[in-house]
Design a protein with these regions (language model features):
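Glycine-/small-residue-enriched transmembrane alpha-helix faces in small-molecule transporters
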Residues: 2-54, 102, 162-189
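Hydrophobic residues within alpha-helical transmembrane segments
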Residues: 24, 28, 54-59, 83, ...
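Specific transmembrane alpha-helical segments of multi-pass solute transporters/efflux pumps
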Residues: 32-40, 65-116, 153
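Small-residue-rich packing faces within the transmembrane alpha-helices of Major Facilitator Superfamily
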Residues: 34, 58-62, 148, 181
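Membrane-interface helix caps of multi-pass small-molecule transporters
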Residues: 42, 66-69, 102, 106, ...
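A helix-boundary/kink motif common to multi-pass secondary transporters
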Residues: 48-49, 108, 135
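C-terminal transmembrane-helix exit sites in multi-pass transporters
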Residues: 63-75, 120-145
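Hydrophobic transmembrane alpha-helices of multi-pass small-molecule transport proteins
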Residues: 64, 86, 126, 138-158, ...
């Protein structure tokens, strides 16, 4: 990427201050996303991991289809147009949901959510390696560490102890976080897509 393109990309992605609506949506997302670890932890006792992933993705697709229709958007018509979305769906949903569901067979929900809090850290590292305009700075790194510590404090020492957690289960959860990081990088390609 040329320095001119990097400068244009950085300028076009400069963040505007978040308003009440954005903060409300972020809070809703946090509740929904955070609650998923609890529900997966409950479901994993009765259902196989891939069934849980299928139900999550199928339910989301069913709920989002009317939103697509209400916004007047159409599904892509060609395989070439579908490909970027298939890649995004794999990186941001199928791969991490599958890895985390398998990981939660031996990892408590609280610990899984703390491990998931490492997603911004992996995203920073991936962006630093693969982009010209998203380099790792000490302030970003410190912010991520404070965020991870905050999640740990909120979840409590019992979640961190993870007495029944296996190294494989924790590694699967972390691999899911790495996939989320690559999804964020891939999502940069889809910025202009509604």
């Amino acid at each position: 990427m040329s320095s001119k393109m990097a400068a244009q990309t950085a300028a076009s992605t400069a963040a505007a201050p978040m308003g009440r609506e954005q903060w409300s949506l972020l809070l809703l997302l946090s509740v929904l996303w955070g609650g998923s670890f609890l529900f997966v932890g409950i479901a994993i006792k009765e259902l196989p991991p891939l069934t849980i992933v299928l139900v999550r993705v199928g339910l989301a697709a069913t709920l989002l289809a009317p939103v697509l229709w209400m916004k007047g958007l159409a599904l892509p018509a060609t395989m070439a147009a579908w490909l970027p979305f298939v890649i995004m769906g794999a990186l941001n949903n199928v791969i991490p949901f599958t890895l985390i569901a398998f990981g939660q067979q031996t990892v408590a929900s609280g610990l899984a959510s703390i491990l998931n809090a490492t997603t911004p850290l992996f995203t920073l590292i991936i962006a630093h390696i693969f982009t010209a305009d998203e380099k790792l700075r000490s302030s970003r790194f410190a912010g991520v560490l404070i965020g991870i510590a905050g999640v740990g404090v909120l979840m409590g020492p019992e979640a961190i102890a993870g007495r029944t957690s296996s190294l494989l289960g924790m590694s699967l959860c972390l691999a899911g976080c790495i996939s989320y990081g690559f999804a964020a990088l891939w999502g940069r390609r889809l910025r202009s897509t509604p």
